[in-house]
Amino acid sequence: MARTKQTARKSTGAKVPRKHLSSKSSFPSKPVNEVLKKTHRFRPGTVALREIRRYQKSSDLLIKKLPFQRLVREIAQEFKTDLRFQAAAIEALQEATEAYLVGLFEDTNLCAIHAKRVTIMVKDIQLARRIRGERA
């Protein structure tokens, strides 16, 4: 197919209604019940269990590196300005942080199960921290 040069067309500024060449549409219309196709939905809890298995298999970090690094620098700024961090130091902090959070959520889940619930709540986290001796 040969390329052709496009020339500028003068615009009138007003919208002109388009002319319909044929009264019938080019594709056959479907009945109403075929048009609205239901999207597939998994049963409640299926996707959550799949995510649990996926994250338990993996060993990579779950918190994004740059936001965590910014948070560390922001907290360190309160104690001393112009601090520098090695990449390995921030990575070690992130490993320790994620290990702590995973352990806390495991204990929190046990507290929720003890209360005959499956949903964790703030009071479960508070109880887990209190039992650990982190909070008076």
From Swiss-Prot:
Residue positions, PTM N6-methyllysine: K5, K10, K19, K24, K37, K80
InterPro entries: Histone-fold, Histone_H2A/H2B/H3, Histone_H3/CENP-A
Primary site of residence: nucleus
Region (Disordered), start-end ranges: 1-30
GO biological process, alphabetically ordered: asexual reproduction; cellular response to UV; epigenetic regulation of gene expression
Sequence intervals crossing the membrane: none
Positions of post-translational N6,N6-dimethyllysine modification: K5, K10, K37, K80
Subunit structure, interactors included: The nucleosome is a histone octamer containing two molecules each of H2A, H2B, H3 and H4 assembled in one H3-H4 heterotetramer and two H2A-H2B heterodimers. The octamer wraps approximately 147 bp of DNA.
Protein name: Histone H3.3 type c
